[in-house]
Amino acid sequence: MFFVTPAYAEEAPAAATGTDAHAAPAAGEVHTETGVAEGEHARGPFPPFDSTTYASQLLWLVITFGVFYLLMQKVIAPRIGAILDQRHKRISQDLEEAGRLKAEADAAVQTYEGELAAARAKSHAIGSAARDAAKVKAEEDRRTVEASLSEKIKAAEARIADIKAKAFADVGTIAEETAAAVVEQLIGSTAAQADVAAAVAAAKKEV
């Protein structure tokens, strides 16, 4: 749709008059024309390139551009801005949530490391206490065993001394009897018991 300029309006009635002249055939004749005189197609330019319609074309271009600009400003741009704002807010919320989760994870890691260090220290302390207790118990057991062995050794030594004393006593008696028998065999008479005992005692001292 175009606005009609005055120049185009002046040309239009002339063209219409020529067309009407050809549009009324005589009675009984067959009309075979298309309503355009021969050679009229080459006279008029293509409407978009017609300089007489530039003003209306520019007017409609300005109107179309204005409508498009208003549509962009009032409808499309606000929607795009709202979408961008919504995405920006969502991204900001996601970043804040990620930061919060990271802080919680760092705190959990620090807590875990602290508890692990405390558990290690406690285990070392328990191990040291157990080793110390084991050393004390082993020392007490060693002393108890040594005391028991010492008592047993003393008892054994006393018994051995008693056995030795008894053995020496028996040996003295046997020696006296043997010496008396030997003297009797040698001299043919029995020696005095006191002399035999004195001789055996002197022999023990020499041994």
From Swiss-Prot:
Key words, A-Z: ATP synthesis, Cell inner membrane, Cell membrane, CF(0), Hydrogen ion transport, Ion transport, Membrane, Transmembrane, Transmembrane helix, Transport
Localization per Swiss-Prot or TrEMBL: Cell inner membrane
Pfam families: ATP-synt_B (PF00430)
Annotated Gene Ontology cellular component terms: plasma membrane; proton-transporting ATP synthase complex
InterPro entries associated with the record: ATP_synth_b/b'su_bac/chlpt, ATP_synthase_B_chain
Topological relation to the membrane, as annotated: Single-pass membrane protein
Main location: membrane
Transmembrane stretches, start-end: 53-72
NCBIfam families in UniProt: PRK09174.1 (NF006612)
Subunit details: F-type ATPases have 2 components, F(1) - the catalytic core - and F(0) - the membrane proton channel. F(1) has five subunits: alpha(3), beta(3), gamma(1), delta(1), epsilon(1). F(0) has three main subunits: a(1), b(2) and c(10-14). The alpha and beta chains form an alternating ring which encloses part of the gamma chain. F(1) is attached to F(0) by a central stalk formed by the gamma and epsilon chains, while a peripheral stalk is formed by the delta and b chains.
Function: F(1)F(0) ATP synthase produces ATP from ADP in the presence of a proton or sodium gradient. F-type ATPases consist of two structural domains, F(1) containing the extramembraneous catalytic core and F(0) containing the membrane proton channel, linked together by a central stalk and a peripheral stalk. During catalysis, ATP synthesis in the catalytic domain of F(1) is coupled via a rotary mechanism of the central stalk subunits to proton translocation.
Family, as annotated: Belongs to the ATPase B chain family.
PANTHER family, sorted: ATP SYNTHASE SUBUNIT B, ATP SYNTHASE SUBUNIT B', CHLOROPLASTIC
Protein name: ATP synthase subunit b 2
UniProt gene name: atpF2
